[in-house]
A protein has these predicted regions:
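Active-site nucleophile loop of the alpha/beta-hydrolase fold
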Residues: 34, 98-107
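Short beta-strand/loop motif that positions the catalytic acidic residue
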Residues: 132, 137-140, 152
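Catalytic histidine-centered segment of alpha/beta-hydrolase-like enzymes
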Residues: 169-179
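Conserved alpha/beta-hydrolase fold motif
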Residues: 73-74, 97
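Serine-hydrolase catalytic machinery in alpha/beta-hydrolase-like enzymes
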Residues: 2-71, 81-85, 127
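Conserved hydrolase catalytic core segment
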Residues: 85-96, 105
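Active-site loop->helix "elbow" adjoining a glycine-rich segment at hydrolase catalytic centers
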Residues: 76-80
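Conserved alpha/beta-hydrolase "acid-adjacent" motif
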Residues: 145-151, 174
Length: 187
């Protein structure tokens, strides 16, 4: 069966949630987990790496195992952010990507500023239309406090794919909506 490269969000696992759904559909999963209580969690070597090291590991994974037009890559939340930076630094990607509830940069949420590493670099690439032309579908919820709708629309406009913002959905999009998107995306 074909493989999917999947990077879940912080705390997400390859063997639960979306990972289980993809496995149930017969796909082999390869990916990286950003799980653990903190960025220096020793129980997960990938999570203990710096941001740039994580990006470089994902670049290596993509170039080694998924550098074909048939490649399928999924990023959820911060996992999408890592994949976006990986592809930005690589300059292109021949496969197909799906970002679910993607983190695309700094955002003020419920009284605090969430500013992921190198958020200005990704923002500049999106605003300057220098993000690589890839096949990218984005699915996000309209009430997701991590969603940057302008950046999501700009990114979608400069890539081959689609942007779907689901009314009334937050950062955790209902599983039935995700399944319907997977049905179309994997077809």
């Amino acid at each position: 069966m074909p493989a999917i490269y999947y990077v879940p969000g912080r705390g997400g696992r390859l063997n639960s949630g979306l990972g289980l759904e993809l496995s149930a559909r017969g796909y082999d999963l390869i990916g990286r987990e950003i799980a653990g209580p903190g960025p220096r969690d020793q129980s997960n070597p990938f999570a203990s790496l710096s941001f740039q090291q994580q990006v470089e590991v994902i670049q290596h994974d993509l170039q080694t195992h998924f550098w074909t037009p048939e490649a399928l890559v999924i990023g959820n939340s911060f996992g999408a952010y890592l994949i976006a930076h990986s592809i930005l630094q690589l300059g292109n990607f021949p496969g197909k990507c799906l970002f679910l509830s993607p983190v695309l940069g700094a955002v003020k949420t419920t009284g605090m500023l969430f500013k992921p590493p190198k958020s200005g670099v990704l923002k500049d690439a999106i605003e300057n239309r220098s993000f690589p032309l890839i096949i990218l579908d984005i699915l996000a919820g309209s009430t997701d406090e991590h969603l940057l709708p302008v950046e999501a629309e700009q990114l979608s406009d400069q890539t081959n794919g689609s942007l779907s913002i689901i009314e009334g959905q937050g950062h955790q999009i209902e599983p039935l909506i995700i399944k319907a998107k997977l049905d179309a995306w994997l077809d």
